[in-house]
Amino acid sequence: MCDGDCRPLGFLLGLPFAFLSLLLSIIGVIIWIVGLLLSCICPCCLCVTVLVEIAIGLIKAPIHVMEWFMSKIPC
Protein backbone atom coordinates (compact mmCIF):
# COMPACT_ATOMS: atom_id res chain seq x y z
CA MET A 1 0.00 0.00 0.00
CA CYS A 2 2.40 2.67 1.19
CA ASP A 3 5.90 2.75 -0.14
CA GLY A 4 7.19 5.31 2.34
CA ASP A 5 6.68 6.77 5.78
CA CYS A 6 5.65 10.19 4.47
CA ARG A 7 2.36 11.05 6.15
CA PRO A 8 1.92 14.81 6.03
CA LEU A 9 -1.73 14.69 7.14
CA GLY A 10 -0.80 12.71 10.24
CA PHE A 11 1.96 15.17 10.97
CA LEU A 12 -0.38 18.17 10.72
CA LEU A 13 -3.11 16.55 12.80
CA GLY A 14 -0.58 15.56 15.44
CA LEU A 15 0.84 19.04 15.94
CA PRO A 16 -1.57 20.07 18.76
CA PHE A 17 -0.74 16.88 20.63
CA ALA A 18 2.96 17.46 20.06
CA PHE A 19 2.60 20.98 21.45
CA LEU A 20 1.05 19.60 24.64
CA SER A 21 3.84 17.05 24.81
CA LEU A 22 6.36 19.83 24.39
CA LEU A 23 4.94 21.55 27.45
CA LEU A 24 5.28 18.27 29.35
CA SER A 25 8.87 17.94 28.19
CA ILE A 26 9.68 21.42 29.49
CA ILE A 27 8.30 20.34 32.86
CA GLY A 28 10.44 17.21 32.49
CA VAL A 29 13.57 19.30 31.96
CA ILE A 30 12.87 21.24 35.15
CA ILE A 31 12.29 18.02 37.10
CA TRP A 32 15.45 16.54 35.57
CA ILE A 33 17.59 19.51 36.63
CA VAL A 34 16.18 19.46 40.17
CA GLY A 35 16.66 15.68 40.33
CA LEU A 36 20.26 15.93 39.21
CA LEU A 37 21.00 18.58 41.81
CA LEU A 38 19.39 16.46 44.52
CA SER A 39 21.29 13.36 43.42
CA CYS A 40 24.57 15.31 43.60
CA ILE A 41 23.73 16.48 47.12
CA CYS A 42 22.58 13.09 48.37
CA PRO A 43 23.53 10.23 46.02
CA CYS A 44 22.09 7.64 48.40
CA CYS A 45 18.48 8.61 47.61
CA LEU A 46 17.06 6.05 45.19
CA CYS A 47 13.81 7.98 44.75
CA VAL A 48 15.71 10.83 43.10
CA THR A 49 17.00 8.41 40.45
CA VAL A 50 13.44 7.30 39.71
CA LEU A 51 12.41 10.95 39.46
CA VAL A 52 15.17 11.62 36.93
CA GLU A 53 14.09 8.60 34.85
CA ILE A 54 10.50 9.88 34.77
CA ALA A 55 11.77 13.30 33.72
CA ILE A 56 13.73 11.77 30.85
CA GLY A 57 10.54 10.04 29.71
CA LEU A 58 8.73 13.38 29.76
CA ILE A 59 11.51 14.98 27.74
CA LYS A 60 11.15 12.31 25.02
CA ALA A 61 7.33 12.61 24.98
CA PRO A 62 6.92 14.88 21.91
CA ILE A 63 8.85 12.50 19.69
CA HIS A 64 6.89 9.47 20.90
CA VAL A 65 3.56 11.26 20.49
CA MET A 66 4.29 12.34 16.92
CA GLU A 67 5.52 8.87 15.92
CA TRP A 68 2.47 7.22 17.50
CA PHE A 69 0.00 9.66 15.95
CA MET A 70 1.55 9.41 12.48
CA SER A 71 1.49 5.61 12.64
CA LYS A 72 -2.29 5.68 13.26
CA ILE A 73 -3.05 7.68 10.09
CA PRO A 74 -3.44 5.51 6.97
CA CYS A 75 -1.82 6.57 3.71
Curated annotation (Swiss-Prot):
Localization, UniProt: Secreted
Disruption phenotype: No visible phenotype.
Signal peptide bounds: 1-29
InterPro entries the record matches: TAXIMIN_1/2
Expression by tissue: Expressed in shoot apical meristems (SAM); mostly specific to the L1 layer in the center of the meristem but also detected in the L2 layer in organ primordia. Also observed in the vasculature of seedling roots.
Keyword field contains Signal: yes
Biological process, per Gene Ontology: fruit morphogenesis; organ boundary specification between lateral organs and the meristem; response to light stimulus
Source taxon at top rank: Eukaryota
Entry GO terms, CC: extracellular space; plasma membrane
Keyword list, A-Z: Developmental protein, Secreted, Signal, Stress response
KW Secreted (keyword) present: yes
Function as written in the Swiss-Prot or TrEMBL entry: Signaling peptide involved in the regulation of lateral organs separation, including fruits and leaves. Involved in the perception of and response to light stress via the control of sinapoyl-malate accumulation, a UV-B protecting compound.
UniProt protein name: Signaling peptide TAXIMIN 1
Record gene name: TAX1
